[in-house]
């Protein structure tokens, strides 16, 4: 009988597809099912309904109950041997317990616990729970519970080198509006390097947060004020001499997906420091800064010098140890199953 897995996770980015591909290469029959946040399904109608609702909690609970019923029905019809859940904040304990009766259930928290209060207690209802930040593993240990450190990863099918001109000096992709740290850092770079071509994708000034601020926002040539797809992101990285990676405020000790995706694309990365980043790249594979002075010096060096040797060493490491293929094999080892 062929091995089978049900993958459940949020629809954003390409993580469901990357996990599906990794399991498929290991000989698994794969069924994937994605959910939306903050309400499922996040259709135009539901988005409007949720926004104007006077009972958002009630509407959310109804959405959660409906999705959990759907998942139980899907589980019954597909009969997987493994249920692999990414984040899973929409799933309730009864659903997890139900699936655990007949399958191995593992959760991979792809965000930190501060962002996933609905997933915090999943550890009590699954076979294994993995965290992408060591401090979340430590939190569970303090509670007398066992969680496992499983960093994020690169989807190598999406992020890979392209033979195109590097016509952009510095680029960044990520949410900006809700991160003062990112805004402050990027604004400082724009001021310091006014003659360089700098391109930033991500919501910088949403129109719904003030139409006049949106119309009159500064540096429109830098801040594109929109999101781009994973494939477009890979192309942008390949066009860039330097790609910035600035972790959000809540990420204190770990690596976000961009860490590995930038490297996978074959671009030179400059990243803010934290203990895990410094441990992972201690031989100069990427530029790591602790303050703006170090950041500016790294940018100057990245623009003036050939960084291909650093890039090649970093990419070799990611392909060997930090792809989705590697992570799924680690999950199977935790479950004591052959990969």
Regions found by a protein language model. Give the residues of each.
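Active-site proximal beta-strand in glycosyltransferases
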Residues: 98-112
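Nucleotide-sugar donor-binding catalytic core of glycosyltransferases
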Residues: 2-53, 63-70, 78, 87-93, ...
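Proline-aspartate-enriched helix->loop->beta-strand connector
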Residues: 75, 79-83
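A charged, aromatic-enriched C-terminal amphipathic alpha-helix characteristic of glycosyltransferases
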Residues: 304-335
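Conserved acidic donor-binding segment of nucleotide-sugar-dependent glycosyltransferases
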Residues: 284-292, 301-305
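Short acidic loop-to-helix transition motifs that present clustered carboxylates
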Residues: 112-115, 155
């Amino acid at each position: 009988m062929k091995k089978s897995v049900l993958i459940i996770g949020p629809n954003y980015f390409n993580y469901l597809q990357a996990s599906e591909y990794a399991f498929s290469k290991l000989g698994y029959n794969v069924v994937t099912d994605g959910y939306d946040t903050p309400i499922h399904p996040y259709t135009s109608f539901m988005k409007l309904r949720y926004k104007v609702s006077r009972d958002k909690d009630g509407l959310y609970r109804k959405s959660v109950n409906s999705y959990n019923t759907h998942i139980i029905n899907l589980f019954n019809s597909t009969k997987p041997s493994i249920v692999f859940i990414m984040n899973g904040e929409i799933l309730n304990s009864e659903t997890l317990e139900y699936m655990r009766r007949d399958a191995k259930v593992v959760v991979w928290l792809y965000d930190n616990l501060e962002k996933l209060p609905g997933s915090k207690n999943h550890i009590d209802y699954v076979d294994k729970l993995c965290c992408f930040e060591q401090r979340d593993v430590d939190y569970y240990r303090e509670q007398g519970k066992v969680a496992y450190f499983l960093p994020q990863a690169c989807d190598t099918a999406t992020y890979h080198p392209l033979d195109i001109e590097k016509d952009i000096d510095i680029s960044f992709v990520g949410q900006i509006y809700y991160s003062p740290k990112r805004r402050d850092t990027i604004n400082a770079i724009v001021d310091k390097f006014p003659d360089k071509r700098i391109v930033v994708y991500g919501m910088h000034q949403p129109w719904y947060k003030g139409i006049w601020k949106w119309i009159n926002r500064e540096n429109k040539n830098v801040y594109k004020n929109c999101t781009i797809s994973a494939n477009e992101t890979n192309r942008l990285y390949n066009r860039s001499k330097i790609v910035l990676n600035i972790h959000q405020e809540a990420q204190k000790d770990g690596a976000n997906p961009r860490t590995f995706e930038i490297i996978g694309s074959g671009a030179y990365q400059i990243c803010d420091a934290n203990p895990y980043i410094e441990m992972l790249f201690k031989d100069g594979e990427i530029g790591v800064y602790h303050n703006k002075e170090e950041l500016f010096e790294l940018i100057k060096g990245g623009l003036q010098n050939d960084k291909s040797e650093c890039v090649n060493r970093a990419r070799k490491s990611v392909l060997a140890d930090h792809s989705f293929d590697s992570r799924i094999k680690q999950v199977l080892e935790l479950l004591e199953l052959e990969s």
